[in-house]
């Protein structure tokens, strides 16, 4: 008995049989395919973040369920995209129990919550690696990545780029 393998995954459809002494083209001896229309779905298949059950007889993994209803899931969406229902906007949801926290929201800075799931410090708005001096950091202007303690400071530009508090127009330090 031979079983048709429409999706070419090496697992045959138990409902597509053929009796033959030799193996017909497109048929195999295995009859364990649970979805012969998808080559990513077969017994013990690796689970993909695609919104579909890939492992035959299993259930949708928890990281592919949108528990908070924000249209984001925890896993990183597979390269083939999201195929399940409901439609999902993206993956990498860092808090799947709070709809206000996901990669699609605008970050609210300085509240101590990584609202956009970027993984960075909530106290480093300009992304220069230095937290704001208003939040125990050393960055005196957290809206400009070129301004932080230790940055090179160009004289006479009116900007305290290195956060030392010195007069930008007094290079020789004589007070004038």
Q: Residues of each region from the PLM?
A:
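Membrane-associated feature with strongest affinity for ZDHHC
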Residues: 1-176
């Amino acid at each position: 008995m031979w079983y048709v393998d429409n999706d070419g995954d090496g697992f045959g459809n138990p409902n597509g049989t053929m009796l033959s002494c030799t193996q017909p083209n497109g048929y195999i001896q295995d009859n364990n395919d649970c979805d012969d229309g998808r080559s990513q779905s077969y017994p013990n298949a690796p689970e993909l973040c695609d919104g579909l059950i890939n492992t035959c007889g299993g259930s949708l993994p928890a990281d592919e369920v949108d528990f908070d209803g924000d249209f984001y899931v925890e896993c990183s969406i597979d390269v083939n995209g999201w195929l399940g229902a409901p439609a999902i906007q993206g993956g990498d949801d860092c808090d799947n129990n709070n709809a206000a926290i996901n990669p699609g929201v605008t970050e609210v800075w300085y509240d101590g919550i990584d609202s956009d799931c970027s993984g960075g410090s909530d106290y480093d708005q300009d992304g220069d690696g230095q937290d704001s001096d208003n939040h125990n950091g050393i960055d005196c202007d957290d809206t400009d990545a070129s301004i932080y303690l230790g940055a090179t400071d160009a004289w006479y530009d009116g900007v305290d780029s290195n956060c030392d508090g010195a007069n930008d127009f007094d290079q020789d330090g004589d007070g004038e």
